[in-house]
Amino acid sequence: MESLSKVAVIGMGKIGTVLATNLVKSNHAVIIADRTPDKAEALAKSLGKLATPRDVVAAIKEADLVILSVWFETIKEFFKKYSVELQGKIIIDPSNPLALAEGGGFKKIIDQDQSAGQLLSALLPKGARLVKAFTSLSAESLSNKAFQQPERAVMFYASDDIGLKDQIEPLIRAVGFEPLRLNGISQSIRIETFGDLAEYGGLGKTVTLAEARAKL
């Protein structure tokens, strides 16, 4: 088993719950937090001793990698509220800039040529570094397509800091996927919903490593 930095998952919605659950399935410890503490405590109880509930401040302080699994529209305020705690942290952003559309489905809430990753990278607290990951697949696929055999499904990620590879790729493998890095946060738009490398976009499905590389 690869060594893994201390991980906190903040936000116990569908994505956050799946990521925390998958980490425990891989026998990795995870810190979990939610603005509603009872949700984090209930999930930790169901996952067992590898999951530790904390309040948001404590979760950030204790972790090296912070998976911020909250709605895109709330992240700017989150950065402001926890700017001191987030200094120097590695922040993993799985958000998609979406809202419910009239008649069903989702619509993009930023300009078509913008990405959540690029917008958030300009708002980072001092010394924090951003990685865009876990955004190209639905919560259902993050659960059902994890740990596939004999070949794992790919999880794309984007970051301007290639030096984060040794921390991010073990995390992605621990969640049950094969990591594949894109060239910087500017590529976030490709892996966010409607992007050409997204399940709900150009790909229409999960892909193997060979299939993914053919799309780059």
What residue ranges belong to the model's regions?
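Phosphate-coordination loops involved in phosphoryl transfer and adenosine-cofactor binding
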Residues: 3-6, 88, 152
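Rossmann-like NAD(P)-binding element
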Residues: 48-51, 56-90, 94-104
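Rossmann-fold NAD(P)-binding glycine/threonine-rich loop
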Residues: 95-140, 144-146
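General beta-strand structural signal in soluble alpha/beta enzymes
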Residues: 53, 92, 129-133, 180-184
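NAD(P)+-binding Rossmann beta1-loop-alpha1 motif at the extreme N-terminus of oxidoreductases
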Residues: 1-49
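Active-site-lining helix/loop region of Rossmann-like oxidoreductase modules
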Residues: 152-216
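Short, conserved loop/helix-junction motifs that constitute active-site signature segments
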Residues: 82-88, 123-125, 148-149
